[in-house]
Amino acid sequence: MRLLTLALLVAGSLAYKFEDCEQKPAALNQVLRVGAKLYSYNLDFFYQKALPYNAIYAFTDVFLQTNLTNADQYQFYQGTNCTTVQQLYDNDNRYFGILRKAALLRSHQLNPFNDTIVGVSTTEPYEISVLIWKVNYFRVGVYVGAIVLFLLASKLVRNVVFYYTSGCSFGLLASLLLVAFIVWRVAPKKTIGVPILIGGWSVSLYMLHFAWSNLQSIMIEYQKYVIGYFATVLLISMAVCYKRGPPTDARSHDIAQWTLQLVALALIYFSVQMVEVSTGTIGALIIQQICRGFLFAGIRWYFVGLKAVWRKFFPARRRLLNEEEYEEQAEKTTKEQLAQLREYCKKEGNRPWKIAGNVRSARRLARFIEGEDDHITEDEIYAHELTGDVLDDEDYDFNEDYGLRTPNESHFDLEDDEDGAEEWDEVVVRRRASEYGRDSVQSVRVPRSVSSRLLSPYQGQNHMNRSLGPGIGFRRDSTPRHGNFQSEHRPRMPRTEQIYRSRRVEYDVKNGRVEGPSSSTASGMTPSEYMRKARRIDATSKTPTRKSRHPTESEDADE
C-alpha cells in the first residue's frame, strides 16, 4: 500500500511538471537516438532531473552532448518547462529567422540543481546524452586562484614581474581590435568607419570564437604567422609598459589593488554553482580584509601564549657547551663586539674627542679603531698568562701548616710544594677584583737567577719589599698602605730566613707601574718595559711562562 501511494505521488508530481507538454519528455539518463525528419517544425523534448542541493556538488557541471558537429544543422533550447522552451523556439523563427540568436550564445551547460527541459529542432538523425562532471577541476582552480589573488593583491600591484605580465596579457587580448581600428582610420568614415566602430567588439568576439574553434588548424597551417603575431604584440606591449613604468604613488597602488580584488570576487562568485558557498567565501574575505590587523594579531598572540604555557610546564632541556664550543663562541662573540665597538667609535655623532679623553692612550685607541692594532697588546697577553690561568698549584710555594682565608671567612688549602735546589723569588701583582669589590693581590714565583736580573734596578735599595715566608704570604706592614688591598695573615718566620729564601717586587696594574720599595728613589718601569725584560729573561730560564713566538724589533734592539 505504501509503495502504491509513493508511486502515485511521484506520478502526480511528474504529471504536474509536464502538464504543459504535448507528450512526456524522455529522460536524459542514457544515450538517446532520434531518427531523421522531413520538417523541423516540432521540437523534440528531453528531461534532465536535478541533483540534490548539497555543498558536495558545488563544483559539479552538467553538459548536453550531441553527435551533430555542425551548429547550423540543429537548434536547441532549454528552460524550466515545455512552454518556456516552445516560446524561445517561436521567437527565434519569427520574421523568417532573421532575429535568430547566434549559436555562439547558446550554452550546452545545464543547471545541475534545477529540473531542465531541453528542446532540439533538426532534420538530421542524432544522438543526445548528458555528461556529468562531479568535480570540475577548472572551477576548483579558478576558485582557489581567485582567493589567492584577493589575498595577495596588495603585494602583486607592487611587483614588477606582475606588472609586465599583466600588461603583456592585456595587450595581447586588446590587439584583436587593432585591425578594426586601422581599417576605421583608413576607410571613409561615412561608409565603413562608423559601422566598424559600432561593431568593433562584436567583430572581436566573433574573431575569438572563430580562432578558438579552429585553433588547431590555424596553429598548424599558419605557424610562422602566429609566432610572428604573438612576438610582435608581446614586444610592443612590453615596450609600452617599460616606457610608462610601474606605478609608484600610493593611490595608484590602491586602485590597482581594489580592481584585482573585485576581479577575484567576481571569479569566486561565478566559479561556484551554489550561491551560499560563493557568498560565504566573499563575506569571509571582506571581513578578513577589514579586520586583518586585529584578526592576525589575535591569532598570533593566542599561539604565543599557548607556546609560553607549554614551555612553562614542559621546559626544554638546556644543552651545555663543551670546552671547544665555549672557546669558539667566545672568540666569535669577541670579534663581533669589537667590530661593533669600532663602528660605534667611527660614527660622527658619538663625539670622538670625548671618547679619546676617557682613555689613557688616545693614539692606541685610534690605531684600534683603524684596525691597525688589537684591543690588547702582547705585553698584556703575557702579563695575563704570567699572573692568570697559566699558573697552577705548583707555581705557588705554600707551607703545609698555613691556609688562606678569603674576605667571606672561607678557608681553602693548597698542596705542598717542595722547593728544589734553586731558590725562588715572588712577583706580586696588584689589581682591582670584581668578586669582592676590593683590590686583589696575586703573586708568581720566578727563579732567583731570573729575579736577580729582573730586579736589577732595585738591587741598591735597602728597603726592598720582602715577603714573610717561602710562599705567597702577605705581611702586615707598619708602613701605611693606600687602597683597600686584600690581606692575608701568616705567622712571621725568622728574619734571616725570610731574607735568604725569597724576595718580592710589586706590580701595580691599577697605576700601570712596577714599584720598588716605598723609600726607594729609583724610577719605576712601565708595564711594557717590565714585560719585555721578563720575556728576555724567560727565554734563557726555566720560568713556567709562555714564550713569545715573534720577538719584536724593540726586543732585538735591547738584546
From Swiss-Prot:
GO cellular component: nuclear envelope; nuclear inner membrane
Record has DNA-binding as a keyword: no
Compositionally biased intervals (Polar residues): 517-526
Glycosylation site positions: 67, 81, 114, 408, 465
Transmembrane segments: 164-184, 192-212, 218-238, 267-287, 290-310
Region annotation (Disordered) ranges: 475-494, 510-559
UniProt keywords, alphabetically: Glycoprotein, Membrane, Nucleus, Signal, Transmembrane, Transmembrane helix
Signal peptide: 1-15
Compositional bias per record (Basic and acidic residues), positions renumbered to this chain: 530-539
Intracellular or extracellular location(s): Nucleus inner membrane
Membrane topology reported for the UniProt record: Multi-pass membrane protein
Keyword flag tRNA processing: no
InterPro entries linked: NEMP_fam
Record-stated family: Belongs to the NEMP family.
Annotated PANTHER family: AT07567P-RELATED
Function noted in UniProt: Contributes to nuclear envelope stiffness in germ cells. Required for fertility.
Protein name (database record): Nuclear envelope integral membrane protein
Species assigned in the record: Caenorhabditis elegans
